């Protein structure tokens, strides 16, 4: 028998083009240089809208995939530069305008502030007393808690980090220019997924986690141990001293050998018990700070680093060993999936929209998961008792997640219109999903109807029974009980199971599932969250709104290329208002319109989630703890009986808790009162664009132009009404901005007052 040697795969190498695109300020100075029509300059006011719509739509600049890839790659560096500048500004505020050092000395008594308003015409009122004689705006970003966890002990260190951020921003701007104009990677480099996976897994995630674990062990842990013991920040050695002077570490962790080589030997000889002083497995929260044990999180990051460094050696590049992604995908055939994943490798290496759609859906879901974990297992010291920050972080990560998920659907639909090739996808999973899209969408539609009528029906029933004075006939914990038995079972399971599955852990991962109240400075950090009928009912509203959002977004993707109504939809593009005047009922069917409608339902969905969270935590978790251990919650546990009627939500949540923002004038919170009003205005302004006929505006504009002509002051650029799609875009943007800013003002004025 002869064994044929494996086919030699071409070697992977980094290939670039030298000086592919000249650097020309003259070209950049010309608006619309990337588009032949736009470059001619404006004839009508539509030009400025098209300029914004197409500036970053690289697909429309060129059809060359290599050039598009380079533009995206370069734009990523530009994006990172903006992020570094933004972060630098945050750190600079911490260094220059904050009470960080005072907060560090008394984190339970002093509120974080990093912004001081200049009293130009009386705005000084916004500088509230945050304790310790400092007057400023209370911040809710959680940065103080993050800085303490990192081991930052004074404002000079923040100053240095801010400068470091600007240096990094400059480096990123240079890299963005360099990799487009000087050394631009070839298309094959962008399509080399094995090398990318190896580098991202081992380098970015593996070494990234390892360096963070190293920082936590050598800097964060000793500094936080001293802070927790009550040592003043100014008496704590500087971070580099802990690294360079092993005797400092030996004082704090005497069991450990802090020698340069001898300290690493136990890791490779599996004698891991040597590290048990600072790589712990405590579980639960640190009772001093109310945050996760920093020694647990250091342990976690070290473990994650090991896993990802191993993962970064799994894919085959130049050494003939490891996985090939194309082989994995083509071998992946289920019993009911036909050709399975065949063709997906080509899809994901030639369509960046397809790639982006998956990444956005994943990152959005991850952000929502982060929101849930940040309050249940607060990762930083004194975060749990800073209620305004907890509420802000939850709300922030929920909104971000919602937007990213909708973005995933948007780019999924763009992929379908611009990049999908039916000939390449024969009987694979993508093709099969598209072939039975009617079954998928009609089932989803049925689920939405079921959830909508039943969840809303429970509320309507309860409102009616309460109005009739028949509490015994209501769905409630004291009437007809609808206990969330599965959720309670999961809570119980997670409280008991770790005793068997993680016998070395001192406590379960999260107190939210069960356990004792964790109190810091007389405030509840976390305690078991009791679930009842009210939660069961709201949960089904969540299920309803999520399913409707998914229905709209998925329908947009699955019907982006064609539908029974418009079989040639792909030819009309991703966004079009209607299929011409000759056909009725073809408006709002483009991929873009589904994203537009999906955004409203995403907004509905996330709003209910953050309202539920805000009220539930104030009612059943957050509050004060008396010396005898009794807990007094902010709203005294009113959620269970009030959140079961629509009237309860309107009266006991929205109206009752809006009193702080409505009555904020004349106090340091007055900016929130103004924001509340102003954001309502922006929201209402959006309706003008959403309930509008384009022809009305065009007629109005023409009579105004006529008047200008009469007076011989007619403009050279002809004014035109917004197109239908532009009007919708302006409408949805203001709707979301107004709604989110209203919620922000409502939440913060409330929780800063009572939290």
Swiss-Prot record:
Q: Where does phylloquinone bind?
A: 697
- According to its UniProt record, where is this protein located? Cellular thylakoid membrane
Broad class of the protein's primary localization: membrane
Q: Which InterPro entries match?
A: PSI_PsaA, PSI_PsaA/B, PSI_PsaA/B_CS, PSI_PsaA/B_sf
| Cofactor: binding comment | PSI electron transfer chain: 5 chlorophyll a, 1 chlorophyll a', 2 phylloquinones and 3 4Fe-4S clusters. PSI core antenna: 90 chlorophyll a, 22 carotenoids, 3 phospholipids and 1 galactolipid. P700 is a chlorophyll a/chlorophyll a' dimer, A0 is one or more chlorophyll a, A1 is one or both phylloquinones and FX is a shared 4Fe-4S iron-sulfur center.
Sequence intervals crossing the membrane: 72-95, 158-181, 197-221, 297-315, 352-375, 391-417, 439-461, 536-554, 594-615, 669-691, 729-749
The record lists [4Fe-4S] cluster as bound by 578, 587
Key words of the record: 4Fe-4S, Chlorophyll, Chromophore, Electron transport, Iron, Iron-sulfur, Magnesium, Membrane, Metal-binding, Oxidoreductase, Photosynthesis, Photosystem I, Thylakoid, Transmembrane, Transmembrane helix, Transport
Q: Which GO terms describe its biological process?
A: photosynthesis
Q: Where does chlorophyll a' bind?
A: 680
Its Enzyme Commission number(s) read: 1.97.1.12
Q: Which PROSITE patterns match?
A: PHOTOSYSTEM_I_PSAAB
Q: Which GO terms describe its cellular component?
A: photosystem I; plasma membrane-derived thylakoid membrane
Q: Which family does it belong to?
A: Belongs to the PsaA/PsaB family.
NCBIfam families linked to this entry:
psaA
Under the subunit heading, UniProt states: The PsaA/B heterodimer binds the P700 chlorophyll special pair and subsequent electron acceptors. PSI consists of a core antenna complex that captures photons, and an electron transfer chain that converts photonic excitation into a charge separation. The cyanobacterial PSI reaction center is composed of one copy each of PsaA,B,C,D,E,F,I,J,K,L,M and X, and forms trimeric complexes.
Q: Which named protein is this?
A: Photosystem I P700 chlorophyll a apoprotein A1
Its ancestry begins with:
Bacteria, Bacillati, Cyanobacteriota, Cyanophyceae, Thermostichales
Gene that encodes the chain: psaA
């Amino acid at each position: 028998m002869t064994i044929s040697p494996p086919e030699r795969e071409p070697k992977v190498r980094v290939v670039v083009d030298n000086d592919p695109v000249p650097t020309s300020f003259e070209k950049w100075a010309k608006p619309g240089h990337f588009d032949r029509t736009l470059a001619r300059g404006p004839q009508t006011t539509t030009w400025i809208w098209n300029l914004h719509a197409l500036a970053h739509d690289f697909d429309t600049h060129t059809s060359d995939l290599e050039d598009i890839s380079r533009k995206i790659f370069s734009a990523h560096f530009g994006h990172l530069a903006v992020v570094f500048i933004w972060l630098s500004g945050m750190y600079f505020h911490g260094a220059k305008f904050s009470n960080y050092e005072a907060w560090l000395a008394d984190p339970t008594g002093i509120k974080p502030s990093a912004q001081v308003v200049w009293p130009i015409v009386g705005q000084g009122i916004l500088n509230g007393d945050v304790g310790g004689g400092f007057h400023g705006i209370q911040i809710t970003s959680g940065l103080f808690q993050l800085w303490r966890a990192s081991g930052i002990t004074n404002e000079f260190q923040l100053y240095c980090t801010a400068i470091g951020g600007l240096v990094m921003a400059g480096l990123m701007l240079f890299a963005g220019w360099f990799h487009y104009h000087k050394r631009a990677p070839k298309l094959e480099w962008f399509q080399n997924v094995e090398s990318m996976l190896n580098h991202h897994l081992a380098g970015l995630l593996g070494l990234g986690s390892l360096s963070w674990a190293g920082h936590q062990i050598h800097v964060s842990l000793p500094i936080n141990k001293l802070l927790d013991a009550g040592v003043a920040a100014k008496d704590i050695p500087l971070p580099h001293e802990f690294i360079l002077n092993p005797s400092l570490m030996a004082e704090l962790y005497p069991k450990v050998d802090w020698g340069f080589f001898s300290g690493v030997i136990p890791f490779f000889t599996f004698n891991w018990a040597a590290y048990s002083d600072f790589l712990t497995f405590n579980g639960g929260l640190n009772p001093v700070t109310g945050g996760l044990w920093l020694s647990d999180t250091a342990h976690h990051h070290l473990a994650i680093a090991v896993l990802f460094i191993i993962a970064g050696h799994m894919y085959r590049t130049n050494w003939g060993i490891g996985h090939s992604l194309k082989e994995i995908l083509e071998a992946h055939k289920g019993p009911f999936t036909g050709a399975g994943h065949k063709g997906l490798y080509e899809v994901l290496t030639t369509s960046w929209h397809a790639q982006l759609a998956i990444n956005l859906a994943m990152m959005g879901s991850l952000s929502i998961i982060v929101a849930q974990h940040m309050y249940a297992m607060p990762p930083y010291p004194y975060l749990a008792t800073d209620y305004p920050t907890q509420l802000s972080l939850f709300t922030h990560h929920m909104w971000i997640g919602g937007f990213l998920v909708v973005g995933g659907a948007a780019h999924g639909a763009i992929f379908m219109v611009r990049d999908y090739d039916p000939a390449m996808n024969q009987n694979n999973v993508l093709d099969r999903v598209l072939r039975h899209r009617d079954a998928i969408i009609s089932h989803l539609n049925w689920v939405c109807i079921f959830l909508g009528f039943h969840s809303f029906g429970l509320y309507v029933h309860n409102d009616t029974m309460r109005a009739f004075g028949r509490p015994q006939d209501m769905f409630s914990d004291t009437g007809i009980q609808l206990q969330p038995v599965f959720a309670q079972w999961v809570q119980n399971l997670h409280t008991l199971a770790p005793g068997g599955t993680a016998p070395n852990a001192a406590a379960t991962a999260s107190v939210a599932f069960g356990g004792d109240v964790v109190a810091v400075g007389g405030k509840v950090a976390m305690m078991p969250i009791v679930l009842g009928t009210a939660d069961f009912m709201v949960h089904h509203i969540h299920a309803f709104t999520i399913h409707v959002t998914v229905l709209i977004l998925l329908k947009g993707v699955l019907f982006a290329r064609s539908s029974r109504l418009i079989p040639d939809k792909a030819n009309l593009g991703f966004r079009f208002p209607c299929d011409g005047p000759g056909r009725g009922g073809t408006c709002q069917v483009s991929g873009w319109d589904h994203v537009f409608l999906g955004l409203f339902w995403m907004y509905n969905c996330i709003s209910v989630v953050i309202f539920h969270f805000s009220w539930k935590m104030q009612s059943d978790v957050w509050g004060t703890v008396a010396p005898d251990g009794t807990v007094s919650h902010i709203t005294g546990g009113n959620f269970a009986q009030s959140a079961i009627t629509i009237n309860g939500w309107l009266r006991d949540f929205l109206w009752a808790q809006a009193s702080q923002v409505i009555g904020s004038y004349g106090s340091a919170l007055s900016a929130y009162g103004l924001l509340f009003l102003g954001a309502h205005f922006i929201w209402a302004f959006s309706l003008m664009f959403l309930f509008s006929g384009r022809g009305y505006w065009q007629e109005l504009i023409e009579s105004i132009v006529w008047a200008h002509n009469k007076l011989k002051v007619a403009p050279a650029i002809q004014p035109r009404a917004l197109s239908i799609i532009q009007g919708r875009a302006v409408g949805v943007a203001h709707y979301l901005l107004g709604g989110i800013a209203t919620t922000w003002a409502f939440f913060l004025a409330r929780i800063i007052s009572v939290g």
